[in-house]
């Protein structure tokens, strides 16, 4: 199928959905955090983790952001034993009014392990979170693919979609993805080494970088849909966001964004289109839609060299 044919096909697919619901005329974004209870921190000391979580949640509440946090339950253990303090961090999220989702137990890639192994890991990943949610009167319903990997074949992707439906899960998409974890790894390393100047430089570079990321996503959405779409942003529960989410939220408001729930974002007709992330690439939904329409999504903006240097080997690892 040629590029023009793909593009026409995409438009024809989207027209019925665009006609069935009014598209958002303003910029909206749902915010999600992966790898709870924590990722990229200078220390795993209980006191620090409690303080970091409190600061992050305080920023979310102060900015009126209805976030969802996605849990890797392997991180609830210490030396293979369930750690009450780390479980307590999830309770803090729930008691602050936020929702939790399943990010698998051990952050496996569906592109790299057999489907049955991945499904078992997902179910193991609800052992603690599910009863915690139930005690708060909430339903565990959101699932986020680690690495955004959805399987390398149509058969695996279809079988896993059926598995999710059978277990009451809804996939949480991502349209704004970035190497935020590189900044976070660099920031945590600078903090761990007591280099306050480096941590300040890294933190100061973070929000301007994310502004460029959003500009790219906004343009790609316009190229595909001819309008703004309700975006879904993925971040991580780390010390960088605990210290700088308020500045990130301020930047987004200056760009005209209103924060919405994940449910609200998925009401955008764009998400009803019969296209999604290509799976094997681990791309955002927006990039997947573009590639399937015969377009080449832009590369992420380059991370500043000093940030990459501070991140070290973490800069080579994806989340």
Label the model's feature ranges.
Residues 1-7:
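Positively charged n-region of N-terminal signal peptides that target proteins for export
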Residues 17-21:
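Sec/Tat signal peptide C-region and signal peptidase I cleavage site
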Residues 22-148, 233, 251:
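Active-site beta->alpha N-cap acidic-glycine motif
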Residues 7-16:
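Bacterial N-terminal signal peptides
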Residues 82, 108-134, 153-167, 175-227, ...:
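Alpha-helical scaffold elements lining the catalytic groove of polysaccharide deacetylases
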Residues 96-97, 165-170:
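Glycine-enriched alpha-helix->loop->beta-strand junction motifs that scaffold or abut catalytic
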Residues 94-102, 128-135, 196-214, 283-303, ...:
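Short, basic, helix/turn surface patches
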Residues 64-67, 173, 227, 237-319:
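C-terminal domain-boundary segment and adjacent tail
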């Amino acid at each position: 199928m040629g590029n023009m044919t793909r593009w026409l096909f995409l438009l024809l697919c989207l027209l019925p959905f665009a006609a069935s619901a009014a598209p958002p005329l303003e910029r909206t974004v749902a915010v999600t955090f992966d790898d709870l209870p924590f990722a990229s921190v200078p220390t795993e000391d209980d006191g620090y983790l409690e303080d970091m979580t409190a600061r992050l949640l305080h920023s979310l509440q102060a900015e009126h952001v209805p976030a969802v946090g996605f849990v890797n339950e392997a991180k609830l253990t210490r030396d293979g034993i369930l750690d009450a303090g780390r479980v307590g961090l999830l309770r803090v999220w729930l008691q602050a009014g936020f929702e939790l989702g399943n990010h698998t137990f051990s952050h496996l890639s569906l592109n790299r392990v057999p489907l049955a192994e991945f499904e078992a890991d997902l179910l193991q990943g609800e052992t603690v979170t599910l009863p915690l949610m139930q005690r708060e009167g909430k339903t565990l319903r959101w699932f986020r693919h680690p690495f955004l990997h959805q399987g390398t074949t149509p058969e695996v992707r279809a079988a896993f979609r059926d598995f999710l439906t059978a277990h009451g899960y809804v996939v949480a998409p991502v349209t704004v993805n970035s190497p935020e974890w590189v900044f976070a790894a660099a920031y945590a390393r600078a903090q761990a080494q007591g280099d306050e100047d480096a941590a300040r430089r890294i933190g100061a570079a973070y929000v301007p970088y994310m502004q460029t990321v959003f500009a790219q996503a906004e343009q790609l959405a316009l190229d595909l849909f001819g309008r703004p779409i309700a975006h879904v942003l993925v971040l991580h529960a780390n010390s960088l966001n605990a210290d700088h989410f308020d500045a990130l939220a301020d930047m987004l408001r200056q760009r005209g964004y209103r924060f919405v729930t994940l449910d609200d974002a998925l009401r955008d007709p764009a998400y009803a289109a019969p296209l999604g992330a290509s799976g094997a690439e681990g791309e955002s939904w927006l990039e997947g839609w573009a590639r399937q329409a015969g377009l080449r999504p832009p590369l992420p903006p380059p991370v500043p060299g000093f940030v990459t240097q501070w991140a070290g080997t973490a800069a080579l690892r994806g989340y």
